[in-house]
Amino acid sequence: MTGLNTAGHDRDYDTAGLNRELQDKGFLLTTTEDLINWARTGSLHWMTFGLACCAVEMMHTSMPRYDVERFGVAPRASPRQSDVMIVAGTLTNKMAPALRKVYDQMPEPRYVISMGSCANGGGYYHYSYSVVRGCDRIVPVDIYVPGCPPTAEALLYGILQLQRRIRRTGTITR
């Protein structure tokens, strides 16, 4: 059965004809959800949870060479004002409750980017008794950025993937 849409009803198909008619007259047809998701992706505020050497690359991403603010992403110091938490580096067992506390202080919808091998799965210190083997055991992670340490370009790509995912799926359901 090729050509059969098994993913469900495509709501854009219904509005495409009406949208074409109204475009000539200067109107735009969209849904409130699409408008909110568009605005949300253009104003992501991230806070750093830098724990090791990956944090240096995270800071490098926010410098003028990469200028992440042109993508609508700006750093914030308080978890109460941020939408995205970037966990960069080795998460120890002692630091895990603090990570969860900061995550709980963030307003909904909140997103987490895990940056680097240590944050993704323990990395070089995976078999150490004091290391959490991935921050996804403490908080739900939306985007994983691989590398040891990942480059600033890799983090920027991860941020753009998060924006794309929010636009495509709306508020990510957990």
From Swiss-Prot:
<keyword id="KW-0520">NAD</keyword>
<dbReference type="GO" id="GO:0008137">
    <property type="term" value="F:NADH dehydrogenase (ubiquinone) activity"/>
</dbReference>
<dbReference type="InterPro" id="IPR006137">
    <property type="entry name" value="NADH_UbQ_OxRdtase-like_20kDa"/>
</dbReference>
<keyword id="KW-0479">Metal-binding</keyword>
<keyword id="KW-0408">Iron</keyword>
<dbReference type="GO" id="GO:0050136">
    <property type="term" value="F:NADH:ubiquinone reductase (non-electrogenic) activity"/>
</dbReference>
<keyword id="KW-0411">Iron-sulfur</keyword>
<keyword id="KW-0830">Ubiquinone</keyword>
<protein>
    <recommendedName>
        <fullName>NADH-quinone oxidoreductase subunit B 2</fullName>
        <ecNumber>7.1.1.-</ecNumber>
    </recommendedName>
</protein>
<dbReference type="GO" id="GO:0045271">
    <property type="term" value="C:respiratory chain complex I"/>
</dbReference>
<dbReference type="Pfam" id="PF01058">
    <property type="entry name" value="Oxidored_q6"/>
</dbReference>
<comment type="function">
    <text>NDH-1 shuttles electrons from NADH, via FMN and iron-sulfur (Fe-S) centers, to quinones in the respiratory chain. Couples the redox reaction to proton translocation (for every two electrons transferred, four hydrogen ions are translocated across the cytoplasmic membrane), and thus conserves the redox energy in a proton gradient.</text>
</comment>
<keyword id="KW-1278">Translocase</keyword>
<dbReference type="GO" id="GO:0051539">
    <property type="term" value="F:4 iron, 4 sulfur cluster binding"/>
</dbReference>
<dbReference type="GO" id="GO:0048038">
    <property type="term" value="F:quinone binding"/>
</dbReference>
<feature type="binding site">
    <location>
        <position position="53"/>
    </location>
    <ligand>
        <name>[4Fe-4S] cluster</name>
    </ligand>
</feature>
<comment type="similarity">
    <text>Belongs to the complex I 20 kDa subunit family.</text>
</comment>
<keyword id="KW-0472">Membrane</keyword>
<keyword id="KW-0874">Quinone</keyword>
<feature type="binding site">
    <location>
        <position position="54"/>
    </location>
    <ligand>
        <name>[4Fe-4S] cluster</name>
    </ligand>
</feature>
<keyword id="KW-0004">4Fe-4S</keyword>
<dbReference type="InterPro" id="IPR006138">
    <property type="entry name" value="NADH_UQ_OxRdtase_20Kd_su"/>
</dbReference>
<keyword id="KW-1003">Cell membrane</keyword>
<dbReference type="GO" id="GO:0015990">
    <property type="term" value="P:electron transport coupled proton transport"/>
</dbReference>
<feature type="binding site">
    <location>
        <position position="118"/>
    </location>
    <ligand>
        <name>[4Fe-4S] cluster</name>
    </ligand>
</feature>
<dbReference type="GO" id="GO:0009060">
    <property type="term" value="P:aerobic respiration"/>
</dbReference>
<keyword id="KW-0997">Cell inner membrane</keyword>
<dbReference type="GO" id="GO:0005506">
    <property type="term" value="F:iron ion binding"/>
</dbReference>
<keyword id="KW-0813">Transport</keyword>
<comment type="subunit">
    <text>NDH-1 is composed of 14 different subunits. Subunits NuoB, C, D, E, F, and G constitute the peripheral sector of the complex.</text>
</comment>
<feature type="binding site">
    <location>
        <position position="148"/>
    </location>
    <ligand>
        <name>[4Fe-4S] cluster</name>
    </ligand>
</feature>
<dbReference type="GO" id="GO:0005886">
    <property type="term" value="C:plasma membrane"/>
</dbReference>
